[in-house]
From Swiss-Prot:
Its EC number is 7.3.2.2. Part of the ABC transporter complex PhnCDE involved in phosphonates import. Responsible for energy coupling to the transport system. ATP binds at residues 34-41. The gene is phnC1. Keywords: ATP-binding, Cell membrane, Membrane, Nucleotide-binding, Phosphonate transport, Translocase, Transport. Pfam families: ABC_tran (PF00005). The lineage of its organism: Archaea, Methanobacteriati, Methanobacteriota, Stenosarchaea group, Halobacteria. It is a peripheral membrane protein. This is Phosphonates import ATP-binding protein PhnC 1.
């Protein structure tokens, strides 16, 4: 379980996060919604360790998360276009391996097998040798997900992973995320501007408004008014 308690983040006089507390469970995909500037990205960056909160705590199974425990997939993917899909996925293991392996491009055989398996997990098993720069937007996002999984995290975060994709491709990417969260028993959190895309696969919804947690509800108990209230808050 990932436990967030009293999380507060300030930028000057502005509170980007205001006393956020929530427990996130393994095997569940949580969808984070809210208007632009509501605090979604700040929350994900704090969970990933890219930002340090001013107050509050984050614990994974009762301890402080290690760097490799949490993986974050960005909207743009942050991939290297000149490298193959397989090489990009292998980069996800760098937090667990000596840095000289990246410089020389030498990875253990078991890491290569795992990376190929991750590409299969996201539906790109036949794309290992393709340069990322030649892939479509949806394929790039799936490579980014595979790379995050190569890190062997307990927590998988994705910040607006389908914002630049058409609805059909976006649904496919979200279905891939949901599948690996459940199959690998991960804690999954995805922020979205289009919450309807996640309706078939979400387990839980969290809503932020002005840095405050204003919605926490199982997907089965959610109605349209709940989502509307988050954006009207």
């Amino acid at each position: 379980m990932l436990s967030v308690s009293g999380l507060t983040k300030r930028y000057g006089d502005e509170r980007a996060l205001d006393d956020v507390s929530v427990d996130l469970q393994r095997g569940e995909l949580t969808v984070l919604v809210g208007r632009s500037g509501a605090g979604k990205t700040t929350l994900l960056r704090c969970l990933d360790g890219l930002e340090q909160p001013d107050d509050g705590t984050i614990e994974l199974d009762g301890r402080a998360p290690a760097t490799t425990d949490v993986a974050l997939v960005f909207q743009a993917g942050a991939l290297v276009d000149s490298k193959s899909a397989l090489s990009n996925v292998l980069d996800g293991a760098l937090g667990r391996l000596p840095s000289w392996r990246e410089l020389l491009g030498v990875y253990p055989a078991d890491e290569k097998r795992a990376a190929i398996a991750r590409l299969h997990d996201v539906g790109l098993g036949g794309y290992a040798d393709r340069r990322v720069g030649t892939l479509s937007g949806g394929q790039r996002q799936r490579v980014g997900i595979a790379r995050a999984l190569q890190q062997e995290p307990a927590v998988l975060l994705a910040d607006e992973p389908v914002a630049s994709l058409d609805p059909e491709t976006g649904r496919d990417v979200l279905e891939r995320v949901a599948a690996v969260v459940r199959d690998d028993d991960l804690i999954g959190v995805v922020s979205l501007h289009q919450p309807r895309l996640a309706e078939p696969i979400a387990d839980r919804y969290l809503g932020l408004a002005d840095g405050r947690l204003v919605l926490d509800r199982p997907a089965a108990a959610l109605d349209r008014e709940d989502i509307t209230a988050v954006y009207d808050d």
